[in-house]
A protein has these predicted regions:
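Alpha-helical cap/lid subdomain in secreted, periplasmic
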Residues: 63-206
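Serine-esterase "nucleophile elbow" of acetyl-processing enzymes
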Residues: 1-59, 71-75, 164, 192-193
Length: 206
């Protein structure tokens, strides 16, 4: 059976807006995706709260994308790798420039291609942050107006990198908005929409 690695942050993990709990397997997009794939594909969930893509996270290796990704890629063979990560690098503590952000996401793509040269990559662009939700929610200490402004530039960056490295691009801005409850995470309805869209792209990729 072919395997898919879903590598990402809290929105891959299934973080429920504001509450901090986790959506169950039938609600988070990775679980729904497995249901849609049935016995055709095995979905491996690798989402982690607060995980950055390319910035060294003070929380540790598990939360630092480029350091922990090789662990998954060396452990088993994946036919398809979904990279759904990047928004945590915009936290106000880190302040990457847009150029540094582009170089960082490209670093993650190169690691993936080096360790899994035959795998197909689906690059997922995060949805733009919601400023009102950020300001009124529990993540106001991690993100600010500059974080939100930079998130509006991500679609161009991900599109450029997807074209450069022959990755399939899925731009979440076209299918799902973040919840106004915290300005960062997705509602259950959005998780369903994301799973259905990714499944369509998987069928085109296989």
């Amino acid at each position: 059976m072919k395997k898919i690695l879903c590598f990402g942050d809290s929105n891959t993990y299934g973080f429920i807006p504001q509450s901090g709990l986790r959506y169950d397997k039938n609600t988070r997009w990775t679980g729904i995706l497995q249901s849609l794939c049935r016995n055709e594909l095995e979905v491996v969930e690798a989402g982690c709260n607060n995980r950055t893509a390319f910035i060294d996270n003070p929380a540790g290796i598990e939360q630092t994308g480029y350091k922990i990704l090789p662990k998954y890629l060396k452990a088993e063979y994946f036919n398809i790798i979904i990279l759904a990560i990047g928004v945590n690098d915009l936290q106000l503590f880190f302040k990457p420039t847009l150029k540094e952000f582009e170089q960082g996401i490209e670093k993650l793509i190169k690691i993936t291609k080096d360790l899994s040269p035959n795998a197909k990559i689906i690059l997922v662009c995060p949805s733009k942050l919601d400023l009102a939700g950020i300001k009124s929610g529990v993540f106001s200490f991690q993100f600010d107006e500059i974080s939100v402004e930079k998130s509006y530039h991500l679609p161009q960056i991900y599109k450029k990198l997807a074209e450069k490295h022959a990755c399939k691009l899925v731009d979440l801005n076209e299918i799902a908005k973040v919840s106004p409850l915290d300005g960062l995470h997705f509602s259950a309805e959005s998780h369903k929409t994301i799973a259905e869209n990714l499944y369509k792209n998987l069928k085109q990729t296989i």
